Amino acid sequence: MPQTPIFPSMLGSTCSGQVQPEMGEHCGDPVYQDGSLVSGSLEVLIERLVPTLDYYPDKTYIFTFLLSARIFIHPYEILAKVGQMCIKQKQQLESGSEADKAKLKSFAAKIIQLLREWTETFPFDFQDERARKEMKEIAQRITQCDEENGTIKKSISQMTQNVLVVLSTRGQFQEVREKIRQPVSDKGTILKTKPQSAQKDILSVCSDPLILAQQLTTIELERLGNIFPEDLMQIISHMDSLDNHKCRSDVTKTYNLEAYDNWFNCLSMLVATEICKVVKKKQRTRVMEFFIDVARECFNIGNFNSMMAIISGMNLSPVARLKKTWSKVKTAKFDVLEHHMDPSSNFCNYRTALQGATQRSQSANSSREKIVIPVFNLFIKDIFFLHKIHSNRLPNGHINFKKFWEISRQIHDFLTWKQVECPYEKDKKIQTYLLTTPIYTEEALFLASFENEGPDNHMEKDSWKTLRSTLLNRA
C-alpha cells in the first residue's frame, strides 16, 4: 500500500470534506484516494504511526497524525497505545528464532527515532507528567534490547534532557511575558494637556526606515519562535465544544498566540500614538511618511505582519481624520501598500505577494531572502476556515484525514518560516523603545487628534466635548 504523500493540495474547490472511499468503507481499514491516505479509524491511524522491522512511517505522516490526533485523544494516551504495540512486537521477536532476536536492536532504534521526532516536533506534549511517564516506560522496555553497550540508553537520556531544556526555556519565556504583559494594559496615557514637542519620539530613536523595519523583523521572528504546532491547534480546540474535546485541560492554553496578537495591536497603536502626539503639522507629516517608508521596507523584507500593523495604525480613525496633515503627505507609496493589503477577493493581492515571498524563500541562498512573516491574523483565519467547512469525522466514523493533511500543510509552512535565522542584530535602544514606550488608549488618541486638528463637523464636536469631560473627570 502506498506511503502518504508530501502534503498534497488535497482540498480543491469541489471538495466538501466527504470522502468517496475506494476501500474499507465499513471497517477500520484506511481509505486511499489517488494513492493518498484520506481517512481511517483512530486505531488504524495509530498503528500506522508505530514502526516495525520492515516499516517506518513517513515524516509527513508522523507530523500530521501527531498534530491532528490531539483533537480526538490525549497525547499521553497515544503514547500508551504506541507502548503497548511496541511491547507486543518486542515479545514476538524475543520468542522467535535467533535471527529474530538479532533484529531487536534494529527495532529498538526505530522506536527511539520515532520518540525523538515526537519530542523534537511536539516537545510540549511532554509537559504532561502522564506523557513523560509513558515515554519512560517505553524507554525502559526498549533499553533491554541493547544492554551490552548502552547505546540506546544514552540516546534516551539525551532525548529526555533535550525535552527538559525546551520546557524550561518556554517556562522562562512565559515568566518574562507575564511580567511585561501587565504594563501593556497600563500604557494608555490619559491626556490632560497637549503633548510637549520636546517629548521623545520614534524619529529621535531611529530615523532610518530600513533599520526600523529590520528591528521590527527581529521582534517578529523572536515571537514566531515561541509559537509551536500545539499552539496553533488550539484554534481548533477552542471551536470544538468542551464536551467533545478530549484535551479539556489544554483548551485555554493559548498564551503564545495571545502574546503575538497583542504585539500586532500594540504596534498599530504605537504608530497611531507617534503620529497623534506630534503637535506641529510639518513634523507630523514627516512621521507619517516615515512610517509609510518603514511599511514598504517591511514588505520588501517579507515581513507582512509588521507591514499590516503599520497600515492598520495609520488607518485608525484618530489618524485617518487628520485631513490637513494627510494633504501634505506624499501618499503614492501608501496607496501601493494599501493595494497589497486590499481585503477584496479574500486578500487576493496579499496572497499573491505572500506566494512570491515563499518562492523567493525556497530558492534563497541567504537568510535575508528566506524571511517570510505572514499576516498572522489571516493565517489563523485560514486554519479556522478549513476547520469550519470540513468535518472531523466521516459518516462511517473514520477520521477525515484529508482535512488534516491540508491543515498540517499550512502549519508546516509556518514552521518553516519561523525557523529562519534572523540576519539582523538587535539594537537594544530601538527595541526597548518599540516594546516599552507608552502608547495611548483609543480615547487619548482621539483627544490628541482633535487637539491637533479641531473637529470639523457637529458629530466630531460632540465627541470631543464628551472625551474631554470624561478624561478630565477621571483624573
Curated annotation (Swiss-Prot):
InterPro entries: Ras-like_GEF, Ras-like_Gua-exchang_fac_N, Ras_GEF_dom_sf, RASGEF_cat_dom, RASGEF_cat_dom_sf. This is Ras-GEF domain-containing family member 1A. The keyword Phosphoprotein does not apply. CDD domains: RasGEF, REM. GO terms for molecular function: guanyl-nucleotide exchange factor activity. Keywords: Guanine-nucleotide releasing factor. The gene is rasgef1a. GO terms for biological process: cell migration; small GTPase-mediated signal transduction. Coiled coil: none annotated. Residues 208-455 form the Ras-GEF domain. It comes from Xenopus tropicalis. Disulfide bonds: none annotated. It comes from the Eukaryota. Residues 33-164 form the N-terminal Ras-GEF domain. Guanine nucleotide exchange factor (GEF) with specificity for rap2a and other Ras family proteins (in vitro). Plays a role in cell migration.
